[in-house]
Amino acid sequence: MAYSVSRLVCSDGSIFSSNTNFETPFQPRVFHPSTSSEINERPDLNLLEGTPRTIVVTSGKGGVGKTTATANLGMSIARLGYRVVLVDADIGLRNLDLLLGLENRVLYTAMDILDGQCRLDQALIRDKRWKNLSLLAISKNRQRYNVTRKRMNMLIESLQKQGYDYILIDCPAGIDVGFINAVSPAKEAIIVTTPEITSIRDADRVAGLLESNGIYNVKLLVNRVRSEMIQQNDMMSVRDVQEMLGIPLLGAIPEDNHVIISTNRGEPLVLKKKLTLSGIAFENAARRLIGKQDYFIDLQTPYRNVFQRFQQFLGF
């Protein structure tokens, strides 16, 4: 590796990196105070008022595990007793149905609703394992539609009237028109990234676009973390990533080979009888997302003491 990962945020907002000449373009981001220091403490006021939380899950860069995160967070929240709908907004390239094992049940899509060919309840696919979890695909595979921001807003407004507690939008990769339309109806966002400098750069760009679209309640999910590489200074720690982006941390998901098995079987990791380390991390992140206090997992002794803070893992 050509760079060191020992970085500190200086008082003037710049990033100091020891033993390196690597110049980072990132500046710590300042979000609304209520979304940073109170991420785990404040009650879910939206649900108390009867307003569903509309959250877009995005990344900028493809291949970082955004759709996997959407499926597992949505399933975990549903298992906690909330009504959840997952919206696959990746037009023509949907994958969320595969990760949930619902690909054979997609008959109608959101485009059929908007074109007047079916009702909303006909396009919604209810998961048979947890009936308070539903899926709505924007379009069928191989179809390419120009979904405008107005039509996307109309669609989400219709879902908000169905009694759901959480609406999670799986955003397309990239920052083109599809991204803008997908984030338009959202009030909150989860940025999924990996501890790689290219992924972090894209996440920083996405964070700026979210701000420009009026989304200030943003949380960070760091995926594919490898503790052995962090200990050898071959990978940035979660704290490095979080401080570079300046976004409140929702969770950190370790690298897990079971993700491939989970995807092929259409069964989210959080449904395994014996949860893997990444499954535990997804469940903990979901609990923090809904406002329940929880701890970051211990990657060294995960099953002996799951709920202790692993400060070395976070880089403290």
From Swiss-Prot:
GO terms for biological process: cell division; negative regulation of cell division. Its main location: plastid. It comes from the Eukaryota. ATP binds at residues 61-68. CDD domains: MinD. Gene3D superfamilies: P-loop containing nucleotide triphosphate hydrolases (3.40.50.300). GO terms for molecular function: ATP binding; ATP hydrolysis activity. It is found in: Plastid, Chloroplast. Disulfide bonds: none annotated. Pfam families: ParA (PF10609). Belongs to the ParA family. MinD subfamily. ATPase required for the correct placement of the division site. This is Putative septum site-determining protein MinD. The gene is minD.
